[in-house]
Regions:
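C-terminal cap/linker of serine protease catalytic domains
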Residues: 1-3, 23, 85-129
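Sec/Tat-exported extracytoplasmic proteins
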Residues: 16, 41-44, 59, 73, ...
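Short, Lys/Arg- and Gly-enriched loop/turn segments at beta-strand edges
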Residues: 45-53, 95-98
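Short proline/glycine- and basic residue-enriched helix-capping loop/turn segments at helix->loop/beta transitions
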Residues: 54-61
Length: 129
């Protein structure tokens, strides 16, 4: 795979490969409080980790969730109860016991707009060797 775009601030990348692989479908629906979600990732280095939870709230680009998100899980998909991707897990808060994901709107806006500015900072750019 090659890096097409990279967002260092949010620890996210868009990769491309010449191989045909199965892909997850993106949801057309916004999440709401109580919505069931599943987070996939590599929690604490354990590849293929899954955690289940619910949406606590949805605010702009942030989805607040009850799923356990630990080191290595960031960048993994947040899946709804129909199997569609609704976000990308991005942070955890151990003390408050809630975690977060970036909504697809927030992620896709940056992915599609290389010059997109978020909070006054240009975050996405073409990756150059």
């Amino acid at each position: 795979a090659v890096i097409v775009k990279w967002d260092e601030e949010n620890d996210l990348a868009v990769l491309a490969t010449g191989r045909k692989m199965p892909v997850l479908q993106l949801s057309d629906n916004a999440p709401w409080p109580g919505y069931w979600v599943m987070a996939l990732g590599t929690a604490d280095g354990y590849e293929g980790s899954v955690s289940f939870g619910n949406v606590i709230n949805f605010s702009g680009n942030d989805i607040f969730i009850t799923n356990n998100i630990s080191s290595g899980s960031s960048g993994g998909p947040l899946i709804d109860n129909e199997g569609y991707v609704i976000g990308v897990t991005s942070w955890g808060h151990k003390v408050q016991q809630y975690n977060g994901a970036m909504s697809l709107d927030g992620f896709c806006a940056k992915t599609l707009e290389c010059e997109y500015e978020f909070k006054g900072v240009k975050t996405w750019w073409d990756y150059k060797d």
